[in-house]
Amino acid sequence: MPWKDLKQWERDWLLYGDGDDPDEMYEQGLWYGIAGFFKYLESRTHKMHVRVYLSRFRTYQECPSCHGLRLRPEALQFKVGGKSMPELSSMPMDELLAWVDRYVTPRADEDPGLKHAVAELRSRLEYLNEVGLGYLTSDRSTRSLSGGEIERVSLTTCLGASLTDTLFVLDEPTVGLHPRDTSRLISAMNRLKKRGNTLVVVEHEEAVMRAADCLVDMGPGSGREGGRLVYSGMPARIGEIEESLTGAFLSGRRRIAVPKKRRKPRQFLTVSGASRHNLRKLDVKVPLGVFTCLTGVSGSGKSPRAHDVLYLNALVEKGAVCEEEPARVKSIKGWEHLDEVVMVDQSPIVRTPRSTPAVYAGVFEEIRSLFAETETARARGMKPGFFSFNSGDGRCPRCMGMGSEKVEMQFLSDIFVQCPLCHGSRYGSEVLSVYRDGRNIADVLGMTVAAALECFSAEKGAKASRIASKLGVLQRVGLGHLTLGQALNTLSGGENQRLKLAKILLDQIGSGANSSKMLILDEPGTGLHFADIEVLLAVFRELVEQGHTLLVIEHNPEFIKSADYVIDLGPEGGAGGGHVVATGTPEEIVAAGKGYTGKYLREVLEGNPSVYDPADAVVPESADMDIPEGVMALRGARHHNLKNVDLDVPRGEMTVLTGLSGSGKSSLAFDIFFAEGQRRFMDVMSPYARQFTEQLESPDIDRLTGLPPTVAIEQNMSRGGTKSTVGTVTEIWQFMRLLYAKLGQAYCPQCGVPVGKRSESEVVELVARELKKHGGLALLAPLVRGRKGHYADLARWAEGKGYEAVSYTHLRA
């Protein structure tokens, strides 16, 4: 019966049951109610699985008191330029910058402190606009940001901190960035460099590589075929290195070809009236049976369009469990053409080291069967399960098939070391003594996918043929460098995504039926080299040929030019986005002449390289401020007794501050230079890390530039405790403890023989040797420890139970 048809007392009974105490109701066999069930669970939230289960039934709701504005009514009465603070927080950054320039900047000279605050506010807003995040609002939850957006937000914090002599390491900052904004990002990174900082950037974007001062190429291949320095030097000369794949693509010797013919859609999935975030009653047709790219600048509505509109509504349509609320739509027509909609992301497949490519691809069972069929295995009665490292008697008894042991390092991070018994093979000696074609099962798991494919392809037999067929799929998706026994939790995001695509192809082989799935991929080019993209595009073509539909959110021009169909959203991000700019083949997108995607796609189709164009960079006004080079420039210091001091302290030299006691030396050195340097460095750190550090007071100054991260060495006049020593202060004692814990050898206090630990199997072998040597051993269990007294009754009790002997003070009785 529907909820709306129930009477009020029936609803109350369902919700609250027959009483207030759910435990008492349960014991009496009465209904404890839905609320009682959750009350029972809330009392057991100390258990992890209970907290995870409860999280499925929780959602965020707007506060009924402030209605999502976060402030009390009294605070809402204060306004600037006719707007309250929550109203400003809901404005996009580009609009907020214009508002500040109109209403706040003209009044900045009214107060010295206000002038500094306005300058800092404007600089951060300008930086956010510069790196392509002008569509974000300041009240936007960081939980909803993509990895690339979070990294660029952090980059603006680094720019605002004005640090120098700092090493910044960036991991693919162009993730989620449209080619329009790449030049802006490069300009921002160049400004960090000009301030005396060093940048190390992990990146595959062509324009970023060409804009680098030094390009380091690692390789030449992946996995075991990589790990070498192929090239280090000017980007323009990498093309001279024959073995460099990067050089081959940058020099034009090798290119990803434009498809000669593009597939025509068979049917369409018609979406009407879709609304979510900046999507407002969007109408669009998604072609089926082809490779479609969903493009647009950052914040144009691509991810909500694919995930919230299509994927979540597909779950509802197919009757699957949907833990998130799907986007509102008027209608979606064409579901009958699809069997399933799958979101293929880069999240880890598993988090345990026990799953491997061989297990995930379904070849490990076949490999174990082949070893169980050998003469040695049959003679010993070994079944396929004996060759499993996840269970059974064949795995190493010490590490239980893990191949490594976790070593706790106390105040340092824990490390994993190779198991000393199996030496990382995961198996016991009995399994490792079984050979097939000169290899035991540990040798096979140590082979790469490519080597194993070559090995099993040369063999005859149905099992070897099935193994080779499945390994061939892994090879085709570009995972030939993985070893069969590599733990899946060590794979990169791109490798995880390709392995998931391989699983779809493998399932197709196993079932033999051609199902029609829509596969949604959000920026699969993340972390991929040109050569990896070439391999992935071949997988896309194979999936489409099997009848699947691919909807790929991507900014990389190599993907867009290879697509059969393009849906371009925009034209801008945030409130300026959410509209369909153009649809059609890549050539039709270029011919339409609308939006930014067509402009950059034209260059790619014509074969022109992607380069950094300073004209595309929006340089903030704050970037033109006069910043002295080679010095820490302090202006307007009024902290404590300082009288508006201006001072330039040269970097890389020793500067001595002197003067009478109380003249302001410590205020200048510690309260300004040290405190401000540490505070700015802490600002660059994540909010989570900052909560564990002391927040220093911001000094009363107008401006301080050219400041590196700082360390203070002070005179501490307080006496340490009785346990404080030079060793504890210098941390020598902590490292000595760790040294003895890891390398110390225990010795018997009586005979001086070294004491060592033994595994269960080693103890069994030792007992067996002693039995052979002495003919018999007595196994004794303690009955009384550390107590004096008469225990004749205890001896008679033991005799009555059938025990043969009692030992008292090491004397047999």
Where are these regions (language model features)?
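Conserved phosphate-binding elements of NTP-dependent enzyme cores
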Residues: 1-812
